[in-house]
């Protein structure tokens, strides 16, 4: 008998199986990886629209007098930059400046902030906030209360309009709406680099919304897309993935996420450590690698400048858009590696030539 914990499942597994999905574990969840193939789903998203079920993402609610003020004193970004109807990328750090998680904070009201962390880190984020919260505030884990459906791509607005859902929000804005009697929070957010939306219907009613979105996506020439395409899309954009480009050992500064830190704030988790690192300068930074020849790079490979190890790959894939192998790598800042320079990556004892570039690998079209 296996002692492995049973994988959690989203609310739409039967629908994914009916669509021919293949599945894999991600963050403790059984998730659809692909339907017709990662490359075709990637291209459908770049050229028309992709429909992603990312209900494994966490959800949590901070509620009570001073909720916004408390979240602002805990998470890195300055919540005072936004207000109700807006969302913000931010980070939850430990006192050493390591990243417990990166997440999206939705400003509902001064006394209500809705959070969407990564699946595997939800409990840790909730625990960190609960440990610091003053009396009168509640931090509630709502992981299975809401599904998350992402519609991404240049024709995503047409898809939502076909369902009568709001589309006029600015990037990182959101609006509460409904479809066929089901309440839906519609957010102008995403993880693909394309114009897109993320929708949060109630967990138990997600199928109604998913079915309608799937039909509308097909009408514009798009398709359902799995986590395989989500990863190739985000890697082309150079977006960090926790556990790869961000972790307890990889700080926001080392991930070039200093823009998501409110440096003028009096308090946030990890502030002193991050201020010290900012003053000294991060010891390593993410760079992009484009393979010169054929092949695919994977995480955990040694990057060399000549014969000297200077870093390690954190993500790697074949880019369907560029038709080459690409990777993200953490490179030592004192190694003197410049954009445009040729370096090598050790792939099972073979030196693979790559060009150093500054991500993103393709142009962002989020706005």
Curated annotation (Swiss-Prot):
GO annotation, cellular component aspect? cytosol; glycine cleavage complex
- Enzyme class, first EC level, given as a word: transferase
The regions listed as transmembrane in this protein's record are none
Q: For this protein, what reaction is catalysed?
A: N(6)-[(R)-S(8)-aminomethyldihydrolipoyl]-L-lysyl-[protein] + (6S)-5,6,7,8-tetrahydrofolate = N(6)-[(R)-dihydrolipoyl]-L-lysyl-[protein] + (6R)-5,10-methylene-5,6,7,8-tetrahydrofolate + NH4(+)
Protein name, please? Aminomethyltransferase
Q: What is its EC number?
A: 2.1.2.10
Q: Keywords in UniProt for this one?
A: Aminotransferase, Transferase
**What task does this protein carry out?**
The glycine cleavage system catalyzes the degradation of glycine.
Q: What's the source species for this entry?
A: Mycobacterium ulcerans (strain Agy99)
Q: Which Pfam families match?
A: GCV_T, GCV_T_C
SUPFAM superfamilies per the UniProt record, alphabetical: Aminomethyltransferase beta-barrel domain, Folate-binding domain
UniProt-listed NCBIfam families: gcvT (TIGR00528), PRK00389.1 (NF001567)
Q: What do we know about how this protein assembles, alone or with others?
A: The glycine cleavage system is composed of four proteins: P, T, L and H.
| Sequence similarity | Belongs to the GcvT family.
Query: What Gene Ontology terms for biological process does this UniProt record contain?
Result: glycine decarboxylation via glycine cleavage system
Question: Which GO terms of the molecular function aspect are on file?
Answer: aminomethyltransferase activity; transaminase activity
Whether Transferase counts among this entry's keywords is yes
Recorded coiled-coil stretches: none
């Amino acid at each position: 008998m296996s002692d492995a914990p049973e994988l959690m499942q989203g609310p739409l597994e039967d629908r994914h199986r009916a669509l021919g999905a293949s599945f894999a574990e991600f963050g403790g969840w059984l998730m659809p990886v692909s339907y017709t193939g990662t490359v075709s789903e990637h291209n459908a998203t770049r050229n028309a629209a992709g429909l992603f079920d990312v209900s494994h993402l966490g959800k949590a609610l901070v509620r009570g007098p001073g909720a916004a003020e408390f979240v602002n004193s805990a998470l890195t970004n300055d919540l005072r930059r936004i207000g109700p109807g807006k969302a913000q990328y931010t980070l939850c750090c430990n006192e050493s400046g390591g990243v417990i998680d990166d997440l999206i904070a939705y400003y509902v009201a001064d006394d209500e902030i809705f959070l969407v962390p990564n699946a595997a880190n939800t409990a840790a984020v909730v625990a960190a906030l609960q440990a610091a919260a003053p009396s009168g505030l509640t931090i509630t884990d709502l992981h299975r209360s809401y599904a998350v459906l992402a519609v991404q791509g240049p024709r995503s607005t047409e898809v939502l309009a076909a369902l009568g859902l709001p589309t006029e929000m600015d990037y990182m804005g959101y609006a509460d709406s409904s479809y066929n009697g089901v309440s839906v929070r519609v957010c102008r957010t995403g993880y693909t680099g394309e114009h897109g939306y993320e929708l949060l219907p109630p967990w138990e009613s997600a199928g109604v919304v998913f079915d309608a979105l799937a039909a509308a996506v097909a009408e514009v020439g798009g398709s359902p897309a799995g986590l395989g395409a989500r990863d190739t899309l985000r890697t082309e954009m150079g977006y960090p993935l926790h556990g790869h480009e961000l972790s307890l050992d990889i700080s926001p500064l080392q991930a070039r996420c200093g823009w998501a830190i409110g440096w003028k704030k009096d308090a946030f988790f990890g502030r002193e450590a991050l201020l010290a690192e900012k003053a000294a300068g991060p010891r390593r930074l993410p760079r992009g690698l484009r393979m010169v020849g054929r092949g695919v790079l994977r995480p955990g490979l040694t990057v060399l400048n000549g014969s000297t190890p200077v870093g390690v790959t954190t993500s790697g894939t074949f880019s369907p858009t560029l038709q080459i192998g690409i990777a993200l790598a953490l490179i030592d800042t004192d190694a003197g590696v410049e954009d445009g320079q040729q370096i090598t990556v050790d792939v099972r004892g073979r030196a693979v030539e790559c060009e150093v570039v500054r991500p993103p690998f393709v142009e962002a079209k989020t706005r």
